[in-house]
């Protein structure tokens, strides 16, 4: 019985986290659109992993990782080296599958979203090889 209860709690926690992540992605996509970015893809799946948002403005493609945390301070430290490497690999797959985008280059942004809906975008948050 305890094992069943633990699995149920994990499942519910996972569903809440997914819903929170989707809400944060909605907030991030709206913020990008207000700044003139066209959101090309949401939750883009590639062989190397998923990209939360892919956006383009003036020929520049931004691969955006969205992080939802209780506070902006906590979210700012939520992207580790392994996640950065995964995002770079996923971006390479996306570019290969979507030729013609990004003639002005690509970059990696992070949008951090606090529980109160406050969002902050860190443009060019890291570079390949960081």
Please give the residue ranges for each predicted region.
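Protein kinase-like catalytic core scaffold
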Residues: 49, 60-62, 109, 120
């Amino acid at each position: 019985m305890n094992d069943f209860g633990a699995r149920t709690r994990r499942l519910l926690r996972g569903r809440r986290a997914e819903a929170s992540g989707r809400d944060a992605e909605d907030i991030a996509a709206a913020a990008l659109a207000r700044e003139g970015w066209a959101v090309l893809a949401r939750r883009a799946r590639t062989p190397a992993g998923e990209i939360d948002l892919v956006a383009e403005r003036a020929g520049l493609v931004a691969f955006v990782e969205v992080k939802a945390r209780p506070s902006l301070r906590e979210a700012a430290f939520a992207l580790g080296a392994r996640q950065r490497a995964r995002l770079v690999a996923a971006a390479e797959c996306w570019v290969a599958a979507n030729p013609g985008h990004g003639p002005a280059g690509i970059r990696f942004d992070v949008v951090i979203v606090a529980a109160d809906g406050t969002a902050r975008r860190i443009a060019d948050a890291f570079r390949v090889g960081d």
